[in-house]
């Protein structure tokens, strides 16, 4: 893939796309970048989870010479039950390993705050990785910390921590099925670059 003067190699999926969601492949698939820097995590394409913004976010990061893989979760289209019990939304061991191959995760979620928080907790409870959460509905560090999720600015009490990974930043206002606004894309890229720099300097993550 040629982007301006830079070349990126992407190992694409063997599965065909669903014809919607901006061209992303079917659930349970990974397109892997040449270097394992960032993984964009998308929910399964379907009526509730149209993943169009993920393609634009991925392309925008690649234009900035950020190496991005894309993982479409197998069970990501499930509706969370009360307490996010096993069976409603889980990661497979393969998906956890695929996520942890990378330095940073960008998690694309939706417009129900409880679902955003619970799915973030489920992912980061299994995958030990810093993450940037992209959603339609606004969420903040306190929302995540109250659910036992480690964050860059607000931490739960030690006995309440329920995640291995940590939320570094979040960007709201990215609507499923719509184009990602330019200002939101710029903010995502800014947070990704800042976090990667912090990781390079061994700063900023617990």
From Swiss-Prot:
The keyword tRNA processing does not apply. NCBIfam families: met_CoM_red_C. This is Methyl-coenzyme M reductase operon protein C. InterPro entries: Me_CoM_Rdtase_prot-C (IPR007687), Me_CoM_Rdtase_prot-C-like (IPR026327). It holds the Pfam family MCR_C. GO terms for biological process: methanogenesis. Keywords: Methanogenesis. It comes from the Archaea. MCR is composed of three subunits: alpha, beta, and gamma. The function of proteins C and D is not known. The gene is mcrC. The keyword Signal does not apply.
């Amino acid at each position: 893939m040629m982007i301006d003067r830079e070349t990126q190699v992407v190992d694409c999926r063997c599965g065909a796309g669903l014809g919607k969601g901006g061209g992303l492949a079917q659930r349970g698939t990974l397109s892997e970048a040449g270097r394992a820097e960032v993984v964009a995590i998308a929910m399964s394409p379907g009526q509730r989870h149209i993943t169009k913004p993920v393609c634009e976010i991925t392309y925008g990061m690649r234009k900035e010479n950020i190496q991005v893989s894309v993982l479409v979760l197998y069970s990501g289209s499930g509706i969370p039950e009360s307490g996010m019990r096993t069976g409603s939304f889980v990661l497979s061991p393969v998906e956890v390993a695929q996520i942890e191959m990378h330095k940073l995760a960008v998690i694309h979620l939706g417009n129900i705050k409880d679902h955003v928080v619970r799915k973030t907790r489920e992912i980061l409870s299994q995958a030990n990785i810093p993450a940037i959460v992209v959603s339609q509905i606004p969420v903040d560090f306190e929302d995540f910390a109250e659910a036992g999720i480690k964050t860059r600015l607000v931490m739960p009490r030690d006995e309440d921590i329920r995640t291995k990974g940590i939320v570094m930043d979040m960007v709201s206002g990215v609507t499923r099925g719509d184009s990602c606004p330019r200002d939101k894309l710029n903010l995502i890229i800014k947070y990704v670059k800042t976090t990667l720099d912090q990781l390079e300097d061994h700063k900023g993550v617990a």
